[in-house]
Amino acid sequence: MTAVQIIDDLVARPGEGKALLDAYMADYAPGARARGMVLDRVLVSPPLWMDDQPNTLTIVWNVEGAAGWWGMRLAAGADPSATAFWETAGARLVSRARRFAAAPEDVETLCNG
Amino acid sequence: MAKFTALITLQPGADRAAFARNIGDTTLAQPTLPGVFDGGDLILHRQVANEAVPSDAAIAHIDSAVYEPIGGGAHEPGLRNGVYRCLLLAVKPGTPEATVRQFESETLAMPHYIGTIRNWRLSRVTKASGARVWTHVWEQEYADIGGLLGPYMTNPYHWARVDRWFDPECPEWIVDTRLCHSFCAFERSVLNP
């Protein structure tokens, strides 16, 4: 099976980076794990908590191939807490992006099923 | 030229095949295949904007649209004995026009990446009824059901690119989560006969 990464890039309002990450881990991560997502890593940029400028949090999850991705997606669709978290988190966010990626050596496998 | 599609849900126990046979002048009137999602029991399609559906006590619900094509193409005109798939979707009111156009453009690029889509058409709805005020109809034809349930679903262009418009967890989300995903077998191509 081929690993697919689900990457959340969160740009926190100044002074909100640590609280945003704490909320993500407390209120979002347990549901994500229940939907089959496996936490790969969390990065904080720059690597200090700033009170007057935005921190960017990069949170990387893994799922297994397209089947794992759809499993996650359909489970999230049936779980109102997934979207509820993003609505609540909006107050601490400047912006965010969610991206889906894989290692270059896995691209052909993913494209050819 | 305007088109019309209706996804007809029948009362429990109604004879789908008999209803389809008696529905009158249509381009397509076929029972849906297993796996549809809010896709009804029958797909009725006309190449003209005749939205009349015979009144029948067997009908429980109809999702339908009259629509004008904005793009499409054919890799296999004249396809026979394939599978027709229809997605009715509703873009959220207030979505900026430029965003809608980007969504449409990316959707129309799906056949470039997903080879099992043999013929396709994307349309804007001019008259809708049913569970939502449908704004778009995304139709495709496949040589067989495997092309829809396999590569269409598993190709990364679908789930890692286009799906973000449909996903409430993505900031780009614009499409109401209530969709009609329906498909049926056909003898002669609906989109490019």
Residue ranges and their predicted role:
Chain B
Residues 1-157, 177-193:
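Short S/T/G/P-rich N-terminal loop/turn motif that feeds into the first structured element of a domain
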Residues 158-167, 171-172, 176:
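Outer-membrane beta-barrel domain signature
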